Amino acid sequence: MTFFQAVILGFIEGLTEFLPVSSTAHLILATKWLGIAETDFVKSFVVVIQFGAILAVIWLYRKRLWQEPALWRRALTAFLPTAIIGFLLYKLIKGFLFESELVILLALTLGGLILIVFERWHRAGEQNTISAKQALIIGGAQALAVIPGVSRAAATIVGGLALGLSRRAIVEFSFILAIPTMLAATSYDLWQSGASFAPDDWFLLLVGLITAFISALIGIKFFLRLIERRSFIAFGLY
């Protein structure tokens, strides 16, 4: 992987992580289209650079995270289903699903159709607070995103809207939920493969992290403005 390729992948990660379009699928397909070899480092790279996007969420929501401890409890509750499934299926995900373009394309297509159908016929809710039970259900929806091609953001958004939450409430909760989810995925992957990283690999990771942080700041602000004026149908079509 070159410096330029690391910048491109970091930009894609940050910009797409919080949009309902599956950042993982974009990264996997981008590595193939850029001709990047499917090494263990590259597989870890597309996971680890998510930490840059995590930092962007923490930075933008730092005051709210400090002032609303209940929000943390709801996010941790929602994180549990993904943690359990991700841990149990880690080897399957890394060894097979990440390499299957068919799985990715099918998941992208199905996810897009669900988003379009749901947005077209579902009536928007008004609820702005999330109960522990609702958080757990949203977490169950997010667990589907362990499959490459299934958008974590789309899964949580559809789950939240189905429970009657307002668009902004579930979108912002999806951002917050990303913190424990992506932090755990990043940390576990580093623990599994960090010892095999060469010095140059660590430099490329840093490049990807910084680029992902900057582009995530842009992506989050863009998405929040967009949902005030537009539906999610455009993302489903995309």
Model-derived features: positions:
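Multi-pass membrane proteins that catalyze or facilitate reactions on polyprenyl-/lipid-phosphate substrates
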Residues: 1-238
